[in-house]
Swiss-Prot record:
Record protein name field: Leucine--tRNA ligase
HAMAP family noted in UniProt: Leu_tRNA_synth_B (MF_00049_B)
One MF annotation (Gene Ontology) recorded for this entry: ATP binding
GO annotation, biological process: leucyl-tRNA aminoacylation
Substrates-to-products reaction catalysed: tRNA(Leu) + L-leucine + ATP = L-leucyl-tRNA(Leu) + AMP + diphosphate
Gene: leuS
PROSITE patterns, sorted: AA_TRNA_LIGASE_I (PS00178)
Gene3D superfamilies reported for this sequence: 2.20.28.290, 3.10.20.590, HUPs, Isoleucyl-tRNA Synthetase, Domain 1
Source domain of life: Bacteria
Length: 862
């Protein structure tokens, strides 16, 4: 056995052993409880970063722990391989996206193996493989047949440089998040899936997800955005044409003083034909900031159309305005404006001199005040200036006004959702072709099963402008039912692939269907899912939706895909910079910088390793290419080993919080593993002795009690609380006690044997290479990965004696060791035998004695 811990000598050897013996290969086994642990699969960008390492280390720790608990554990890995970065890299490197992607996959797979992750590599998938996207295409055609897919013209955010549609969240300050180009509003035909048909179920079933972070569930609830209100019809005064608005506040309806429509609304388009100034404003709105955060903070602008509408209940004429804060793809593209009771409407009305009419007053006795010279009164209250509805509270007014609108045939109660149908068309090349066609007359046709997969050609040349399948007229040409037909040249949104990959892992080589139902129903739902909170809405919502679709097609028998969700925090690192001659920041890698720090680890001085000149610290920020502060996992593994990296990742912060990279912290983790190794050498040297619980002295009982307390804490911290950092702290505390304990008597050695075995198993999920090697060195049977998690010996936790704190008037005066079953009277008698106690009680009156059993006795005297 090596005297010193040397990870470079053992880790690659152990990884080969795991691979050659398929240690992590798993199949369905009805005799065992299953456990499916999944970390969000990576985009094959070329190299793993520390964010990946943290995510996958957490998943591996959970997986290995559950295996040690006796469960049949599946932990797969694959690649979210389609997407725009591959196209950009292909253009830059003059290669095909497929070639670039497959090379990256090969490299990153090697990196994952070097970190010792226990994946069943026989289940590996890549979403760019036709064998994968074939079934996605098949499912899309079935959704089309069921009426859950449709095509329509849609106003989209168009990036003129990347030539693709952007989600609202991908538009930053009116520009494309990747290209930086000014985003345009453009109408193009797009395919949609009717996620809105499942909106209520998606909302309701959030209540079933008891082991999801509340923050994620709240974000999804807000995104789905269920509201109860009224659809109300307004009639134009010039041509009697009607248009509808939706409101959640019908109680304010009598206070409508204008109506606002989106720039894309038919009324706005008509007005633009009549007025150059209106046309100019409508064009300006096309370049609006369109994310919701931007909409909330941007300046509210508008222009009058010159048209008016009739208020359905008062008969008053109200002007119709075009406003930049009304979006065509939300609701009907028109809103009723009540400036007295909506702050946005108030700001707009104030800016343009529009009427403000109060129709809600505070409830009698309320301390709320109304000051319409300053701001809108947005609270609920009682109606005023509302004719027959005066005096009604919110609920009564809601129903009374809704009843009247319905009776007059100009409105109806309606449940509305903010959620919109999922637009899955993308105008890029590197994605799954959408399995739809059109005939010469433009009629829609779904690809038949024998046409699938509709293959994406991989040997292509990227020109940086047009998708190769759009540029090649021959690619789209085919025949269907003996007649000419043309393939759709748009590709799927890559969220399509990531919305069902978790299910395909259950039967990745199944070629007779999308899923093998028996395998899917054995493994699903995923017991533990791990990934960043940035996926809280789109990916996690689409996956939940897809799972319900799979259920309704009889492919799975559960309602939700992921039982438990853990969202890990970001990895931060110190950032360093210099100024160039123009005053711009030049970011310098932390690996090129020497530093001095204060006692709290804060950088006080920094200089470049090469030239010795000073550099400046900009503090901690997320590891990124833009700030050049990423730490290459390969460098750290080469220096310290994978187990050190894993231990640092799990120990430095709770999993859901940000983790600050620290070279000193990495060194500390490495020192701990060296101490564990040394302890194992010492224990092996003294040999094995059987444990005799009846022969233990008091010190040995205390040490064994500490061991089993640690087992209990680590078990709970890892399984229930998922506070892996505190679990590791408990193991470290135990190891310190073990290292100080003597190895002289037989029972000293017996306890050391028991403790070392338990400690190696508890460390095995976190530092699997070290635990595997020491397990073998100690001559233990089998592989540690197949060992059983240590059980708590309850008898070891029973204390013969207790340490009791003695206080007088709340101040510590003595500490007494008493029998564990000592009564209050016995402890009190012993306390009053102590001179350090009687010094403060003699000559005064003892008012009462308070006893907290097994912990504290406080004498109150004066």
């Amino acid at each position: 056995m090596q005297e010193q811990y040397n990870p470079q000598k053992i880790e690659s050897k152990i990884q080969r052993y795991w691979e050659e013996n398929k240690v992590f290969k798993v199949t369905e086994d009805e005799s065992k409880e299953k456990y499916y642990c999944l970390s969000m699969f990576p985009y094959p960008s070329g190299r793993l970063h520390m964010g990946h390492v943290r995510n996958y280390t957490i998943g591996d720790v959970v997986s290995r722990f559950q295996r040690l608990k006796g469960k049949n554990v599946m932990q797969p890995m694959g690649w979210d391989a389609f997407g725009l970065p591959a196209e950009n890299a292909a253009i830059k490197n003059k290669t095909a996206p497929a070639k670039w992607t497959y090379e990256n996959i090969d490299y990153m797979r090697t990196q994952l193996k070097q970190l010792g992750f226990g994946y069943d590599w026989d289940r590996e998938i890549a979403t760019c493989h036709p064998e994968y996207y074939k079934w996605e295409q098949w499912f899309f055609t079935k959704l089309y047949e069921k009426g859950l897919v449709y095509k329509k013209m849609s106003t989209v955010n168009w990036d003129p440089v990347d030539q693709t549609v952007l989600a609202n969240e991908q538009v930053i300050d009116g520009r494309g998040w990747r290209s930086g180009a000014v985003v345009e509003q453009k109408e193009i035909p797009q395919w949609f899936i009717k996620i809105t048909d499942y909106a209520q179920e998606l909302l309701d079933d959030l209540d079933k997800l008891e082991d999801w972070p509340e923050q994620v569930k709240t974000m999804q609830r807000n995104w789905i955005g269920r509201s109860e209100g009224c659809d109300i019809e307004f009639k134009r005064t010039d041509n009697n044409e009607t248009f509808s608005v939706y409101t959640t506040r019908p109680d304010t309806f009598m206070g409508v003083t204008y109506v606002a429509v989106a720039a894309g609304h038919p009324i706005a388009k008509e007005a633009a034909k009549n007025s150059d100034s209106v046309a100019l404003f409508v064009e300006e709105c096309k370049n609006n900031k369109v994310s919701e955060a931007d909409m909330a903070t941007m300046e509210k602008k508008g222009i009058a159309t010159g048209f008016f509408a009739t208020h359905p209940l008062t008969g008053e004429q109200v002007p119709i305005w075009i406003a930049n804060f009304v979006l065509m793809h939300y609701g009907s593209g028109a809103v009723m404006a009540v400036p007295a009771h909506d702050q946005r409407d108030f700001e707009f009305a104030t800016a343009y001199g529009l009427d403000i009419k109060q129709v809600i007053a505070p409830v009698t006795g309320s301390d709320l005040e109304v000051n319409l010279n300053k701001e809108a009164f947005t609270d609920k209250g009682v109606l005023v200036n509302s004719g027959e509805f005066d005096g009604l509270d919110f609920d009564a007014a809601f129903n009374a006004i809704a009843d009247k609108l319905e009776a007059l045939g100009v409105g109806e109660r309606k449940v509305n959702f903010r959620l919109r149908d999922w637009g899955v068309s993308r105008q890029r090349y590197w994605g799954s072709p959408i399995p739809m066609l059109s005939d010469e007359d433009g009629n829609e046709l779904a690809a038949t099963d024998d046409m699938l997969p509709v293959r994406l050609p991989e040997d292509v040349v990227m020109n940086g402008v047009t998708s190769p399948i759009k540029a090649d007229p021959n690619w789209a040409k085919t025949t269907m039912n003996g007649a000419p037909a043309f393939h759709e040249t748009d590709t799927f949104d890559t969220f399509m692939e990531s919305s069902w990959y978790y299910a395909r892992y259950c039967s990745p080589r199944h070629d007779e269907g999308m899923l093998d139902p028996a395998a899917a129903n054995y493994w699903l739902p995923v017991n533990q899912y791990i990934g960043g909170i940035e996926h809280a809405i789109l990916h996690l919502l689409y996956s939940r939706f897809f799972h319900k679709l799979l259920r309704d097609f009889g492919l799975v028998d559960s309602d939700e895909p992921f039982d438990r969700l853990l969202c890990q925090g970001m990895v931060l690192a110190e950032t360093f910079y210099r100024k160039d001659e123009k005053g711009a920041d030049i970011w310098i890698s932390p690996s090129d910088v020497n530093t001095e720090t204060d006692d709290k680890g804060r950088v006080t001085k920094a200089w470049h390793k090469v030239d010795g000149n000073p550099v400046f610290s900009s503090g901690m920020s997320k590891m990124s290419k833009s700030k050049n502060n990423g730490i290459d996992p390969q460098h750290v593994i080469a220096q310290y080993g994978a187990d050190t990296v894993r231990l640092f990742m799990m120990f430095t912060a709770p999993p859901e919080q940000t983790l600050e990279w620290s070279d000193a912290g990495v060194e500390g983790a490495h020192r701990f593993l060296k101490r564990v190794w040394k302890y194992a050498v010492d224990v092996k040297t003294v040999g094995f002795q059987p444990l005799n619980k009846t022969a233990l002295n008091n010190e040995q009982k205390v040490l064994r009690r500490d061991l089993h307390k640690a087992i209990a804490k680590v078990s709970d911290d890892v399984e229930r609380r998922q506070t892996f950092n505190t679990a590791i702290a408990a193991i470290m505390e135990l190891s310190n006690k073990l290292l100080k304990a003597p190895l002289n008597s037989k029972q000293d050695v017996a306890i050391a044997n028991e403790a070392l075995e338990a400690m190696l198993i508890m460390l095995a999920p976190i530092t699997p290479h070290l635990s595997h090697q020491l397990w073998q060195e100690l001559g233990k049977e089998g592989d540690i990965v197949n060992a059983s998690w240590p059980e708590v010996d309850q008898s070891a936790l029973v204390e013969d004696e207790k340490l009791i704190i003695i206080q007088v008037n709340g101040k510590l005066r003595a500490k007494l060791t008493v029998a564990a079953d000592a009564t209050k009277e016995q402890v009190e008698a012993l306390a009053f035998e102590q001179a350090s106690v009687t010094k403060y009680t003699d000559g005064v009156t003892v008012r009462k004695v308070i006893y907290v059993p097994g912990k504290l006795l406080n004498v109150v005297a004066n």
